[in-house]
Curated annotation (Swiss-Prot):
Active site (UniProt): 140, 195, 208
Family indicated by similarity: Belongs to the cutinase family.
Entry GO CC: extracellular region
Reactions performed catalytically: cutin + H2O = cutin monomers
Keywords attached to this entry: Disulfide bond, Hydrolase, Secreted, Serine esterase, Signal, Virulence
Protein name: Cutinase
Pfam families per record: Cutinase
Compartment(s) where it occurs, according to its Swiss-Prot or TrEMBL record: Secreted
EC numbers for this chain: 3.1.1.74
Function of the molecule: Catalyzes the hydrolysis of complex carboxylic polyesters found in the cell wall of plants. Degrades cutin, a macromolecule that forms the structure of the plant cuticle. Allows pathogenic fungi to penetrate through the cuticular barrier into the host plant during the initial stage of fungal infection.
Mod. after translation: The 2 disulfide bonds play a critical role in holding the catalytic residues in juxta-position; reduction of the disulfide bridges results in the complete inactivation of the enzyme.
Organism of provenance: Colletotrichum truncatum (Anthracnose fungus)
Site note Transition state stabilizer, residues: 60, 141
């Protein structure tokens, strides 16, 4: 898979958009099976709930509601493990436009409407399928969406969330590498040593786009261990 750079130099310091990078052949071959938009939670029936519901928030400027990087890769791995019929995949879309400007919003690092949309989806999962295992993920600005939304959920809904994987977490320094008010044992953070975003800045370096291997391997393994 390759990514298209669509950000000008003037805004590159705050962008979380994919740029063109080469990936290994195994990951690249996933492209044909992945979709940038998934809405199984919203469209699925409560009479046919799956084993797993995966909710994901994409990076800035990524297309659809899942993007074309970490989210679909993790989704594919979960579907391969549990079977497509036993995994509902849902991207955070609608009010969450994944725009660049929202990265500047302090202290959340994303918009209030985006946070509320993610909270709505977690609540929907709980009301529609309370016995399904909910897992979640985010990439770049999407990690800010997930961190804020999950931290504001009721304990009942938080308890249904079995695990969360966050890649290139934009609030890593500010949140001390965790989701506030949420169990650290349920959270896995992937932040590359060379990714400046992980140190409390919005400087975008090449390492910010190199999380596909984690998304294909360690992230789904962590979630599967939490799901059981």
């Amino acid at each position: 898979m390759k990514f298209l750079s669509i950000i000008s130099l003037a805004v590159s310091l705050v962008a979380a958009a994919p740029v063109e990078v080469g990936l290994d052949t195994g990951v690249a071959n996933l492209e044909a099976r992945q979709s940038s938009t998934r809405n199984e939670l919203e469209s699925g029936s409560s009479s046919n709930c799956p084993k797993v519901i995966y909710i994901f928030a994409r990076a800035s400027t990524e297309p659809g509601n899942m993007g074309i990087s970490a989210g679909p890769i993790v989704a594919d791995a979960l579907e391969s493990r549990y079977g497509a019929s036993q995994v509902w995949v849902q991207g955070v879309g609608g009010p969450y436009s994944a725009d660049l400007a929202s990265n500047f919003i302090i202290p959340e690092g994303t918009s209030r409407v985006a946070i509320n949309e993610a909270k709505r989806l977690f609540t929907l999962a709980n009301t529609k399928c309370p016995n399904s295992a909910v897992v979640a993920g985010g990439y770049s600005q999407g990690t800010a969406v997930m961190a804020s939304s999950i931290s504001e959920l009721s304990s009942t809904i938080q308890n249904q969330i079995k695990g969360v994987v966050l890649s290139a977490i934009t609030k890593n320094l500010q949140n001390l590498g965790r989701i506030p008010n949420f169990s650290t044992s349920k959270t896995e953070v992937y932040c590359a040593l060379a990714d400046a975003v992980c140190y409390g800045t919005l400087f975008i370096l090449p390492a910010h786009f190199l999380y596909q291997a984690d998304a294909a391997t360690s992230a789904p393994r962590f979630l599967a261990a939490r799901i059981g």
